[in-house]
Curated annotation (Swiss-Prot):
Keyword S-adenosyl-L-methionine: no
Further comment found in the protein's record: The C.albicans mating-type-like (MTL) locus contains, in addition to the genes for the regulatory proteins (MTLA1, MTLA2, MTLALPHA1 and MTLALPHA2), a and alpha idiomorphs of a phosphatidylinositol kinase (PIKA and PIKALPHA), a poly(A) polymerase (PAPA and PAPALPHA) and an oxysterol binding protein-like protein (OBPA and OBPALPHA).
Record's protein name: Oxysterol-binding protein-like protein OBPa
UniProt-recorded Gene Ontology molecular function terms: sterol binding
A GO cellular component annotation in the UniProt record: cortical endoplasmic reticulum
GO BP term, pick one: exocytosis
Species: Candida albicans (strain SC5314 / ATCC MYA-2876) (Yeast)
Keywords of this entry: Lipid transport, Lipid-binding, Transport
Similarity comment: family membership: Belongs to the OSBP family.
Family annotation (Pfam families): Oxysterol_BP
Source organism phylogeny: Eukaryota, Fungi, Dikarya, Ascomycota, Saccharomycotina
InterPro entries: OSBP_sf, Oxysterol-bd, Oxysterol-bd_CS
């Protein structure tokens, strides 16, 4: 059976026992109100997935392969990125810390604290379409602060998601880009999470922390139980202080080892002195050991922090290519576990994108993002970001000015009036400033 036939069969797939499960509101111990927590990989589903993957070669790029909808999360990757910002109290604590080393440790703790925020089942976020945007905000997160987030899919092949985060009252901003590259590895698939984020603390002389991400592995896609693992090295470094963290996300060996373990160190790159050792599990408790004193303490307890979810404008105020509006029919079908409709709705979005891409080629029109501009060759320290928000932010400005500036870029708050400037390509708006 060919790849197309396998995908067509998905339209006929209906989950057995679904009605009974909905009545009890529980499937495999998870609340059906959140279908992202439900493992829907039954025997037929695994057979379909195996039929698709059996036609692939190890190392093959999966970005152009249409995967069955029962492994999809009910959100776009642009929204999934906001998981990093859902433990804001830890970031604000780091910002309040005056000691350079302790501040670095606190920044690392904040960054490690968010990796456990994910569906209980193995789910993959929806691939954003070119020009898709997701904007959101947080009110009164801590210390009387608010936060704003703007994101845009700046490239589709390869997929590149640019994002910007700002806490005006605390003079904190984050510029980042995520470039996931999927690979087939036999009984596993891998999402190589390329891209970097730059966290800037304006209250500490614009101190910048550069950080990347661990890679994501999905095990057991051909046989065995599907399991998501984080693997490989994650780095956090601050050039101003010379402090660096190297965190190794351990993957379980075939015979020995354990799931979800991390090991790492914090060192001073200027002196090569190793200051701390990090151990634990990224989805449970992580500890830090001072190598001078031998004292060990909890760095992060993931159960002690409750994620603060972002807020978005009402659906009726959103534009056609804002994530939640664009994917609403697909997401609604996924929530009902109606994979026939979910597949059809997802295909409709993707088919429209193919038509738009063809029209751009026919018309000789090049796509340009409207919120993010390309980094130019003179911006040496920003090269790994590739794209940045088009407006320059002076973190010395007062919070009111910073808030006005971020709201002038994109519609974020409920009731915010649409401005025609929002639609102008970012590089043109940057040239005018």
């Amino acid at each position: 059976m060919g790849l197309t036939s396998k995908l067509e069969k998905l339209k006929l797939k209906e989950l057995t026992g679904h009605e009974a499960a909905v009545k009890s509101n529980v499937v495999n111990g998870a609340d059906t109100d959140d279908t992202d927590d439900i493992d829907e990989m039954d025997n037929e589903g695994q057979s379909i997935l195996m039929g698709i993957i059996a036609q692939l070669r190890p190392g093959m790029d999966l970005s152009r392969i249409t995967l069955p909808t029962f492994i999809l999360e009910k959100k776009s990757m642009l929204e999934r990125i906001t998981n990093f910002f859902q433990i804001p109290d830890m970031l604000l604590k780091a910002n309040r810390t005056s000691d350079d080393v302790e501040r670095f440790v606190s920044v690392l703790a904040w960054y490690l604290a968010s990796w456990h925020i994910a569906p209980k089942a193995v789910k993959k976020p929806l691939n954003p379409v070119l020009g898709e945007t997701f904007n959101c905000y947080w009110e009164n997160i801590s210390d009387d602060c608010s936060a704003y987030y703007i994101s845009e899919q700046v490239s589709h092949h390869p997929p590149k998601s640019s994002y910007f985060y700002l806490v005006p009252e605390a003079k904190i901003k984050v510029d980042g880009i995520l470039i996931p590259k999927s690979r087939f590895l036999g009984n596993s698939s891998a999402a190589m999470m390329e891209g970097w984020a730059h966290l800037t603390l304006g209250e500490h002389e614009n101190e910048v922390y550069e950080m990347n991400q661990p890679n994501v592995y999905c095990r057991g896609i051909l046989f065995g139980k599907m399991k998501m693992e984080l693997g490989d090295h994650m780095y956090v470094k601050c050039r101003k202080t010379g402090l660096e963290a190297d965190i190794d996300f351990k993957t379980k060996g075939f015979i020995s080892g354990t799931y979800d373990a991390i090991e790492g160190v914090i060192k001073n790159s200027k002196t090569s002195e190793v200051l701390y050792q990090i151990t634990g599990k990224w989805n449970e408790v992580m500890e830090i050991k001072d190598l001078k004193t031998g004292k060990k303490r909890v760095l992060v307890d993931t159960k002690s922090s409750v994620p603060v979810k972002p807020r978005v404008r009402p659906l009726e105020e959103q534009g056609q290519y804002e994530s939640r509006k664009l994917w609403k029919p697909t997401i609604d079908a996924l929530a009902r576990r109606d994979h026939t409709v979910a597949t059809e709705e997802k295909f409709a979005v993707e088919d429209e994108q193919r038509n738009l891409a063809k029209k751009r080629i026919d018309d000789g029109v090049e796509f340009h993002p409207k919120f993010f501009r390309p980094v130019n060759e003179k911006e040496v320290e920003l090269q790994d970001l590739e794209y940045v928000i088009y407006k320059k932010f002076d973190l010395k400005s007062n919070p009111e000015v910073l808030t006005d500036e971020v709201l002038s870029i994109a519609p974020i708050l409920p009731g915010q009036k649409h401005d025609e400037k929002f639609e102008i390509p970012a590089f043109k708006k940057h040239e005018e400033t």
